[in-house]
């Protein structure tokens, strides 16, 4: 057909075909299918089928031969044999001529169609190919993963095989161990029966032994009573002999003293004295209660001389004597005073001190009505100024007066120095009345010489103590021979002069001339005290005593000046009278007022004179006129002068003038020297008023200071020196100008105010002196008093209407001067007087400038805040107002209670340089002053000076920081952990919020700065509570292993709240933080940590102080293993950790779209397996096999699993819990009896908590089916939990600040930590793990700054409520572990035997002293008061060594005798804390044996009686407590080793406080042990006693009952056979080697004893 189609010849047959086709078309038009017959229809159908087949063939041909498509166009007609022709025919017949188009009109179109089709097919094929390639790669990856899974499966299978093999081995071992234990139980039961049988036999023996012991006890009691009786008799006899000895010594001393006086009297009579020898030597009282005892090491024996100012007690004479140290045995060359003075020596005076003490009690010194008589050794200060020892610079300013030219005052009345002759005590010290007749015809030079040599005779005594002399360099204890020679020479001259001074007949006495026998000046006391060579040094600490009242100008005598203190017994009585020159001196009647004396004389008329007191302190300063003052000017006035220079008659005339004497003010007086001197002033008023005779003046002036000037100058001098007596006499004169001013313009009032003499100021003001008189610089007395800080003078001047606002030439006001010198009292007084605070000086300074310039904070506070109260209620308002500025300037703001009273203009006032007070404070670095200024609201810190500098520009670094934080807002930053639930998980002690620091928000603070500050504060806080850098704990080993980080950071914060408004970290609001905080009145910033609600554990970490990584690890274990149990000691926060982990898991699952439920069940003793099954089924954790798995997450927490047996409770659930699938079902029977198969699904988590340190027995079978998390007390996280928690508690207590290392709170918290650790360490050492405590109980430790007592009380409550009961239960549980099974352990706990009670009390006492009381921060006295609050604290155990760091190693010979020798202290001998003080002396050994009550007694083995009621000793071993068990013996050993470790005492020293023990020894005991044996309280027992023997010897406390320093030990009750000595000795060596007391090993030949309990054999052998 292709050939035909391809031919180029024309087809001749087409024409007839066309004609036939046209006819057919015409027929077709008329063709009707309905009219066709059946055959036609069949033919038509066959034709159509043929055409269809032809079409199929064409399609197939076209597909096979595509080239023919391009050839079809050549053919115009087709043959009938060509199937293509049929297609052409159908085409032409089916359409009109217009629509007909050739099939292959264009080969290109056909090619394009084919190419388009091919392109589509190619794209489809490429797509399918890429998909096939991707499927191939995926398949290869799946193959690789499958291979890896296969390998892992193989490894896991191998590992499971290993675990199965190990488990099988463990099970076999456990089965074998169970068999062994069952066999041991049977053996022990048999042994128990044998022991019970032997106990019956032993009871008989112990009864006999008890009878013997009772007999020995009675004998011992009798011997003890005899010994105590003898001791009492010895004590009584010793006291009697001592009293008799004292009486004899006193009598001997009195006799020696009388002999010395008689010798001196005879010697005086031999010299032919002109005085009357008929004066009788008065007798002394025989009261020997106050006899003094001489000291041999103090040189010559001295006796005290009575003083006139001592109070009258039991004397018949009322004349007081001055205490003065005189030699009891004078040398042969002792000089004598003149015969006209006589005195007595009191034998009952205590040894006196040469010199004076400024700290004399004012009440004791002012109590006497007699005048003040100074010691002669002190008058040297009056005549010559301060001693060189006290004022070494005196020689550079004022030349010293030579001893040859300056006389000393005569003897004080009633004082005899180195002479037995009684002195004339007729009147007061400064009385002008003459008692010795001086005749007017006497030459003044002779009188002065006589006075001089009499005065110098008193300079030194035999001890080298100078009494009255100018500064001399050769007066010392090493030059006594020289002194004696000088005294002899002086007394020789005195005897020669006495002829010229004898009374002359017919010569009237000179009026106003004081006698030489009564001319004595009272010495002042320098600021640094007197120092005499060879004498005791005077105390120079306190100022002179303050007089009880101030003297006025009344005409009544005032009390005398307080006597300068000399150590004299105040209770002694002076019993000496005196007669002077036929003038009988009578004691003053008791009805007279204090300070007055009645002088009764036979010849002269009666006259009385006031007692003129001295000033208590003297300092030489420059006088206003610039001249030096004589030393005599410093003395007090004692008499009026003679009628010379036209002055008035003296005071001792017939008309007596009573002038009040005045006690100087309490402050040290600085006298001002006289201004000028002239030759005519030798008899000036000041000299005669001082008690010196005018005839002595020329001698005084030679080589001494310049003479004094006239009356006005004297007035100034008296006012400057505070000489009230002289001042009052001068003011009483007529015509004296009280307002006289010297060259500098200083008036008398100004001088008195400058030196602070308030009494002189009062006198001058009463004399109408000008109160506002100014000196040449414009300063008034008020200015001077304010500048010097003389408060009383200021009060007087203000009361006299002084000008309070007076300004000097420079503009200085009194307020300015007071602020400049920091006198706060004066400032307050001036402010109350209404002074103006704004007055400026010439330089522009105000009082505020002056206060700031000196840096005086108190002065500045007064100026700014003190509001002067109203005149009517000033005294009432003074206290509350003072509180406004008396607060600490740096911590609290004064605006809280008061507002500044000064204006802003005054605070901002600038001086000539433009500097304000703030400039001054900032430039000098006075931060406190600047802070007070900044509190004023009107301060302008930006104010500039003339150099254009602000306060910040001139400030120091500290002040710059203060200015930068001037207006900073202080906002506390808190950390919140949200709500910790539930409450029964131990969360009561967890604080929800803690203040960590205070944020400072300034105006320029941005939100970025604020965010950084918050982050930095959080980071610093987390580091502070994690690190131990600021913490000092005893146990360094614990801290070395502690992780220093808890894993928290700033990113742990979930949200931050400013007040009540949340603030996303890093976000910036429109207002600045400053404006935001002020606008919203934000009081705090709270940082909320992410918690379990967010699926995090940060808040749990902060609340519990468990590191975050640890908690995350726990959470991973729960999610991975599904079955986890937390176990540890009670109080290890197991429940809290489990519940918080469950909460975190719940919120995580809920966030993932799963529902979750937490089921908590508390297991108690009655919780059964059926109840647990119901719990699993009801919570849908255990589901039937037929039921489909649930998608709900279920978390079950079983708490307190230690209350039941794990094997019984969880035994049936172990297999389904381990294999959670339907392939491993387990059949459980319900309560109704129906059984069904159940299984645990994968969405169930089981957590349990056990308050037990370790598992025992059958519970170990459960261990392999759970993942166990052990919370050890000595490992993380429990180890560092308590330190971190308490550290955070301290930081919160101090409001975010870490306290100083010296703060006592550190010691308190460190003590609480050490108690927990030492307690657990001791309990672990005892082998009682069930008594271990977790840190939960110690989380409530109170942190009270400065009050450690609260922590000790809390510790006592914890000890009594928790620790002690647990320890008791653990000890009883262990001690009764091998008792008879029928009795039961519970019965032993309820009714413990006496031996068990003894062991428990011993253990409690050891734990209390070793773990609790050791390291307590309280002082020992306070700790002893709190010890009784602890249970077991009264047990008689040594607490000295346990409280101190180490026990005492040295013996104290008299330690025990001090408390036990007296029978009265017999009952309290056990309470004396001297158990660890061994005594090596024989007596000490004997007494120590008594005190320790046979410390070798075996406490745990001897079955002690009750510590409360029983007194008798028994060795009956109770049937309920067999100490033959291994556990009991081990417990005793551990108690022993615990006592011997560190500073603890040995357990063998524990003794029953109500029982007395006896020792038994053999005749062969060594001498070292003979002392305790010979003690009458310890009778000797028989040599051989049947011991308690056994198969196995158990080491007990007697193996260590030796004394600490190697002294032979006190023995136990029974001896040990010879065969057991070697073993006992080895035990002794082994136990002693573990002790820190370094005891030497005991010789094997010494007596060694041990307890052997199992009585199977009896051996009777004596010890060797």
UniProtKB/Swiss-Prot annotation:
Subcellular location field: Cytoplasm, Cell cortex; Cell projection, Dendritic spine
Coiled-coil stretches noted in the UniProt entry, renumbered to this chain: 119-276
Role summary: Regulates the dendritic spine distribution of CTTN/cortactin in hippocampal neurons, and thus controls dendritic spinogenesis and dendritic spine maintenance. Associates with the striatin-interacting phosphatase and kinase (STRIPAK) core complex to regulate dendritic spine distribution of the STRIPAK complex in hippocampal neurons.
Positions of the UniProt region annotated as Disordered:
1-23, 268-440, 455-479, 495-618, 871-900, 1447-1483, 1558-1664
One MF term in the entry's GO annotations: protein phosphatase 2A binding
Supply the name of the protein.
Answer: Cortactin-binding protein 2
Q: What GO cellular-component annotations does this UniProt entry give?
A: actin cytoskeleton; cell cortex; dendritic spine; FAR/SIN/STRIPAK complex
Residues bearing Phosphoserine are: 1525
The organism of origin for this protein? Oryctolagus cuniculus
Q: Which UniProt keywords apply?
A: ANK repeat, Cell projection, Coiled coil, Cytoplasm, Methylation, Phosphoprotein, Repeat, Synapse
**Stretches with biased composition (Low complexity):** 368-379, 395-407, 1625-1639
Q: Repeat: is it a keyword of this entry? A: yes
Q: What is its main location?
A: cytoplasm
UniProt-listed Pfam families:
AAA_lid_NAV1, Ank, Ank_2, CortBP2
The annotated regions of Polar residues compositional bias extend over 1587-1600
Where are the annotated ANK repeats, by residue? 710-740, 744-773, 777-806, 810-839, 843-872, 913-943
Q: Does the keyword Aminoacyl-tRNA synthetase apply?
A: no
